[in-house]
């Protein structure tokens, strides 16, 4: 099929890939860690004290509105001849209210984005979310999946977000994630990210068994690089498109020398988009 599905990863730098996939149309998909998109109202149920007008960060209404405008501009900048991205996955949003204010920003209001979001048990009060264009993605349902890591039963972190529907005549499932950070030590926290990856792999396997034709896109801040154990071994991702099966997961960033952020003068690619094999069978990038 001569169709194209465009995935764009937007973080500290912009990474784009164009995949031959399905419809005679382009569908833009992006992930963006917006880093602390909080409103200015104190929520006693979460630790948002640093993101208030009188806090050390002086998170005022003006700064909040400025950030909304910046995030909207980033989304708008990914527009192409087919318009705004069809799907925008986000990490580190405080609540639905900030998303409702984001989608009416003048830069993107004409996209008429719909919202998928659930409050998570994360201690910082940050969640993942997904915006989508209903004229491109017909959503049949969405749900939050609570993270369950056996080695850390009291872990309070971001839920996984699953959104399923139809795009370009194809059945789709989007999974938005934000794995636990490396704070406390890479090795000391690795089991948390591996536990998350195990759960995602189980979800993928169950979907593949029930509906082998459904195409899967996993995207988010995984706080690990594509060659780290959680992604390479636990998710069992492949770095080449040759001989992919519908049950395989492909990482387009497995061989890249650049990344999505820089720390200690070193590139990291913690922000990832991973695709099911049935999106790439018979193609070469």
Place the predicted regions along the sequence by residue.
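Bacterial N-terminal signal peptides
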Residues: 7-18
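N-terminal, active-site-proximal structural segment of metallo-dependent hydrolase catalytic domains
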Residues: 22-106, 112, 116-128
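Catalytic metal-binding/acid-base residues of hydrolase active sites
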Residues: 35, 94, 180, 222-225, ...
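Active-site His/acidic residue clusters
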Residues: 45-48, 170, 174-189
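Second-shell loop/turn segments in exported
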Residues: 53-62, 84-90, 117-118, 149-151, ...
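Structured beta-strand-rich core segments of catalytic domains in phosphoester-bond hydrolases
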Residues: 93-171, 179
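Metal-dependent phosphoester-hydrolase catalytic domains
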Residues: 206-216, 224-285
